[in-house]
């Protein structure tokens, strides 16, 4: 096992990365090694998909499958070895189909990269035996640590882009050009590139690709559900039977709401599903009563205390046996945990039956509401008033503080930072990092809330659109605005969001609570020199430096 993709990975003087029987996330060495086999097999499949495109053969099913299966290897997504083996076998089937179509066109495997010729084992044990040749750090003794770090930066960034591609696909947003670029990068990374400049360029290409994907996802969500609007959301429960929907998939939320009409079951969002409550479409369901809990890392306590059924529509899942709720949590799509019921289709009757059999909430809790819904359209509508207040000196600065949440004690930095920003500044937030401060009262500036919840992590697209609108209004570049980005990272979606911002030329971003363990000191120095990227220190010191600039 070798895995170094998330913020909680093991760090030692001897080297970084989880490399024992189990990773810090709970992923076993077996599952980790199988995921490496899957990734290499997918890189080979992408090579075949590229070759097919050269002959006018485009298979939209394969275009959808590769990023979806790649998504299964993200942090806290799929811990079920049998499911990973099934993805490998499906990838091989698709590859054989493409090879059969290309054979009459004289396209042979020996003309393609080595990954395209890789033959995965027929079963779990056979695939495990192949792990050394497919490990994500294969060839580590043949290249320096900077090359390996850049390979991993690109691989993990592309994982994040793959996740957003799958989220967009669920909303009927697919693009052949985006898929072709994804296959190109996926295939190239499978060749184990060893030159610094092409790898840096690849990282920027991934960032630009992801910007297009975020645009597709934004279009898919707003077409299906309308534009989010400022909305007050209840964050305390009400009496009644209940289902909790976590993850990111609003289509699953829609299906659950439809299938629970008239049942008396209340539906709650959790984690990154909170922004769904701001979409006009979901306001037609009175039994969507609010949001429960906070960010992913608290689920073992929060799910244990939730007296109903839980559905994980995407990341993040952690061991449900710790809180003894594995019999009432259900997984969907790419999510998996051994022994947990997985729902293959769109029938949620098993979830409904479980909710009806459970106690539900018995008591009324004091009402507590928070305001959400400041995504792209709402921000654009508010922009003229914001611009006027900037010109009048009523708003001095904009802070975007958000990203991933996590367990590390140092993440208290984000709460402290949010509390400490000047009263004449606006605080934008997105991702589950918002839970560090989104239940605090920040007041308003002339009727404009100081805390503006932009949405899910992918709604960084909305924040970028606001920055572009402000730069146009003030006739300056984005980097000349009184705008500071302070991001928290945990996994690969955050990595690709960062690559997107860097590829768009955004500078002087601060990230924390730690630097990714796969980035060497030399690579971090390059990122600081080229982009002004800095690590967080203390809220007081960082804020003083920002305001003095």
UniProtKB/Swiss-Prot annotation:
The keyword Zinc does not apply. The keyword Mitochondrion does not apply. Its EC number is 1.7.99.1. Keywords: 2Fe-2S, Cytoplasm, Iron, Iron-sulfur, Metal-binding, Oxidoreductase. Its cofactor is [2Fe-2S] cluster; hybrid [4Fe-2O-2S] cluster. One of its GO terms (molecular function) is hydroxylamine reductase activity. It holds the Pfam family Prismane. This is Hydroxylamine reductase. The gene is hcp.
